[in-house]
Amino acid sequence: MRAIRMLLVSALTLGSVTAYAGEQDVQRLTQLLEKSQTIEANFSQLTLGADGTSLQETSGKMTVKRPGLFYWHTDAPQEQVVVSDGKNVTLWDPDLEQATIKKLDVRLNQTPALLLSGDVSKISQSFDIASKEQGEVMDFTLKPKTKDTLFDSLRVSFRKGLINDMQLIDSVGQRTNILFNGVKANQAVPDSKFKFDIPKGADVIKE
């Protein structure tokens, strides 16, 4: 009986420690994300199949601004521009001369870019969060709490308090790694940066 009681006490104690650690992880991640009201950076993106085969490699520049504004420009030869004005997202494909416009999904588990530019005050409602610190690098692993999501796992890494890289893993094991460099935080960025003017004569698709 005493052994059972000891196990119960241990389990309760461990449960309390885990919950506390989880709350700390949420607070640390929220503080790091909210610390940067604007971010400008270059990025390189690599997508790997479940077997490790390279599927796509791109690079470009991005700018984000809270709340909900972002601009991602992927360079040629696979050039595309994705812009959010906080209400709608416009995807511009210059090769097709086509713009696709859809309403911004403000759910963090549907639009990962909003981790860097959206409202993260309730991030724990969408994800279970764990952290790991190694020197000047802080890693956070986010697991969606629902199945209605674009990815199974998301890792966000910070170096010296600034975003360093992100990794998304989807349901079939495909991994997308995004490395940021030349990161500048809290610079003055006008809202006009997030207004995309569709070229005349382009095809426009509204979803």
UniProtKB/Swiss-Prot annotation:
Keywords: Chaperone, Periplasm, Protein transport, Signal, Transport. One of its GO terms (cellular component) is outer membrane-bounded periplasmic space. It is found in: Periplasm. GO terms for biological process: lipoprotein localization to outer membrane; lipoprotein transport. Coiled coil: none annotated. The keyword Protein transport applies. It comes from the Bacteria. Its main location: periplasm. Residues 1-21 form the signal peptide. The keyword Chaperone applies. Belongs to the LolA family. Participates in the translocation of lipoproteins from the inner membrane to the outer membrane. Only forms a complex with a lipoprotein if the residue after the N-terminal Cys is not an aspartate (The Asp acts as a targeting signal to indicate that the lipoprotein should stay in the inner membrane). Monomer. This is Outer-membrane lipoprotein carrier protein. The gene is lolA.
